[in-house]
Amino acid sequence: MEKFELHILGCGSALPTTRHFATSQVVNLRDKLFMIDCGEGAQMQLRKSRLKFSRLNHIFISHLHGDHCFGLMGLISTFGLLGRTAELHIHSPKGLEELLTPMLNFFCHTLAYKVIFHEFDTRQTSVVYEDRSMTVTTIPLQHRIPCCGFLFAEKARPNHIIRDMVDFYKVPVYELNRIKNGSDYVTPEGEVIANTRLTRPSDPPRKYAYCSDTIFRPEIVEQLSGVDLLFHEATFAESELARAKETYHTTAAQAARIALEAGVRQLVIGHFSARYEDESILLKEASAVFPNTILAKENLCISL
């Protein structure tokens, strides 16, 4: 299968700790890199991950709280020091361009590349990025400020040609694309060769969903249905349910309920409150609801 990986750069929340970096992730789809959130220290973690800076062209910011975007200026500046010339696209809720432009003009006025901002409405689902391989769609969340998650959906690939059968029936090269896309082949004698004899199915397309920060929000279950991997914030244990509601965050058990109801394959929980020196309590509570749960941790790489 083609590469589809999630790299956890940081999984902490607002208050810094010595255990975790602030929230940031990188999706690697066929060696194209897409960053999700860019907390403080993200570029250091990107270095540790051994991912190539030059392959990162799109950054998706969920909301404008500092623990999700304070790393942007440092990363943008470093790209300049590395001699970057390719455009950098930053997708975010309204307001980020207004905040960063004065700092870019002051600290990074000699950049040899363009930083292009794309704003989206967090209140509705919309496609914010698309290429031949993938779409990125927003997931409306509910936090103290406008916030959304992101659904990375691989596009279905054409069927694979069975070379021996194509050679046996002497299929012309110009017919191969049609056959890959599901057409039968008709021989010069008029015999219909079923597509199933000439091809085998491609691997099913994969999906990754990122949901942070949000209060418990069952409305997102339908959009998350059947995803291969779900990252959902789990800031608090169930004993802090009132605090979770007050701050518009989620407990580990609530994150697991979302995963269970959506029928996802695997759940990763993160965005841990600094109060937990040992997050095993969060894993225990989530696993009791959805057994296939793991804890996020720095430098973790998950293959879909």
From Swiss-Prot:
Q: Does the keyword Zinc apply?
A: yes
Known catalytic reactions: Endonucleolytic cleavage of RNA, removing extra 3' nucleotides from tRNA precursor, generating 3' termini of tRNAs. A 3'-hydroxy group is left at the tRNA terminus and a 5'-phosphoryl group is left at the trailer molecule
- N-terminal signal peptide: none
State the needed cofactors, names only. Zn(2+)
Name the positions where Zn(2+) 1 binds.
Answer: 63, 65, 143, 213
Do the record's keywords include Manganese? no
What InterPro entries has UniProt attached to this entry?
A: Metallo-B-lactamas (IPR001279), RibonucZ/Hydroxyglut_hydro (IPR036866), RNase_Z/BN (IPR013471)
On cofactor binding, the record's note says: Binds 2 Zn(2+) ions.
Recorded hits in Pfam families, A to Z, give: Lactamase_B_2
Tell me which domain of life the UniProt entry assigns to the organism this sequence originates from.
Bacteria
| EC number(s) from the headed UniProt entry | 3.1.26.11
Q: Which GO terms describe its molecular function?
A: 3'-tRNA processing endoribonuclease activity; zinc ion binding
Instruction: Recite the UniProt keywords alphabetically.
Output: Endonuclease, Hydrolase, Metal-binding, Nuclease, tRNA processing, Zinc
- The membrane-spanning stretches of this chain are none
| Binding-site residues for Zn(2+) 2, renumbered to this chain | 67-68, 213, 271
- UniProt-annotated catalytic positions: 67
- Quaternary data: Homodimer.
What is the role of this chain? Answer: Zinc phosphodiesterase, which displays some tRNA 3'-processing endonuclease activity. Probably involved in tRNA maturation, by removing a 3'-trailer from precursor tRNA.
Q: Which family does it belong to?
A: Belongs to the RNase Z family.
Record protein name field: Ribonuclease Z
What gene does the UniProt entry assign to this protein? rnz
